[in-house]
């Protein structure tokens, strides 16, 4: 029979592994979201650099609805600053602001990837520990079965 303490430790390891795996998944989702934001910023920077005064563009209204609008001044760009604040900037300054956001996103993504690597290492170590514990429990169980078999003296 397996030791209750070992079985409990194995259960605890399993729960820790599950929690780590869930955290890794959450961090990966966050990385994906940040990468999507980076793509959006790249597209905005490209658009700013190719905008021309007098050009007609489609402006999203939400819910997949758009309106056509004419660019009056391609050098006046409104850039979100965060927390629902925005500022009007020249095209060059807007690209610079967006580039700064890109750098911050790069740093955050790198930090998240480091966290993921650490958690994956921890997960691997816990998996090895759980496997060793299972092997040990199986060996003990086999030994107990052998000890319980009657010996033939004939």
From Swiss-Prot:
Ranges of Low complexity composition bias in the record: 128-148
Coiled-coil parts of chain: none
Pfam families assigned: Prefoldin (PF02996)
Keyword Cytoplasm belongs to the record: yes
InterPro entries (UniProt xref): PFD_alpha_archaea, Prefoldin, Prefoldin_subunit_alpha
GO CC term, one of those recorded: cytoplasm
Listed name of the protein: Prefoldin subunit alpha
Organism: Haloquadratum walsbyi (strain DSM 16790 / HBSQ001)
């Amino acid at each position: 029979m397996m030791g209750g303490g070992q079985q409990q430790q194995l259960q605890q390891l399993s729960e820790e592994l599950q929690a780590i795996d869930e955290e890794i998944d959450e961090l990966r989702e966050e990385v994906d979201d940040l990468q999507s934001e980076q793509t959006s910023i790249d597209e905005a920077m490209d658009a700013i650099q190719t905008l021309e005064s007098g050009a007609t563009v489609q402006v999203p209204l939400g819910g997949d609805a758009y309106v056509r609008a004419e660019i009056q001044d391609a050098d006046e760009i409104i850039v979100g600053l965060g927390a629902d604040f925005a500022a009007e900037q020249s095209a060059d300054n807007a690209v610079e602001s967006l580039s700064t956001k890109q750098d911050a996103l790069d740093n955050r993504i790198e930090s998240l990837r480091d966290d993921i690597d650490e958690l994956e290492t921890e997960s691997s170590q816990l998996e090895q520990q759980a496997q060793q514990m299972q092997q040990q429990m199986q060996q003990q169980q086999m030994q107990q079965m052998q000890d319980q078999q009657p010996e033939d003296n004939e």
